[in-house]
């Protein structure tokens, strides 16, 4: 295939991997048709993104952004800056993403007005440094 197809396939594959990891395997694959309509494969059925909760949509967008960053930066590690992006996440979703970010061993800056992120980092025993501005 052409370069666009190759990049698209790699992006879809990595997005699917990340989404599967942060959802505990609940969503195994991100699918996209020619009209760029997205759906996910649960392993049992295909679900259109219109039928997913806002929290799950946010997980898909997170996985897509992380996959795009990896694709464009190649083997170079890149810092991740997240500015109040977890508002629609419940505690389980947020804990899964925080653990995934820790596992990736890259610099992560989380800007938030909530204490929940710190509480969940503490609960999961993920080391961090807090800075109050």
Positions of predicted regions on the chain:
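Charged, surface-exposed helical/loop "interaction arms" that form contiguous linear patches used
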Residues: 1-23
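Conserved ABC ATPase signature
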Residues: 2-10, 38-65, 85-91
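ABC transporter NBD signature
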Residues: 19, 53-55, 73
């Amino acid at each position: 295939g052409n370069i666009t197809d190759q990049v698209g396939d790699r992006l879809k594959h990595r997005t699917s991997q990340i989404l599967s990891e942060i959802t505990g395997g609940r969503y195994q694959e991100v699918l996209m048709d020619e009209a760029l309509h997205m759906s996910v494969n649960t392993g049992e059925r295909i679900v259109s993104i219109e039928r997913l909760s806002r929290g799950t949509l946010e997980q898909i967008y997170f996985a897509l952004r992380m996959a795009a960053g990896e694709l464009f930066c190649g083997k170079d590690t890149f810092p991740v800056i997240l500015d109040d992006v977890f508002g629609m996440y419940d505690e389980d979703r947020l804990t899964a993403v925080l653990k995934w970010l820790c596992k990736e061993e890259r610099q992560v800056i989380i800007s938030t007005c909530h204490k929940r992120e710190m509480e969940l980092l503490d609960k999961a025993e993920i080391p961090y440094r807090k800075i109050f501005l």
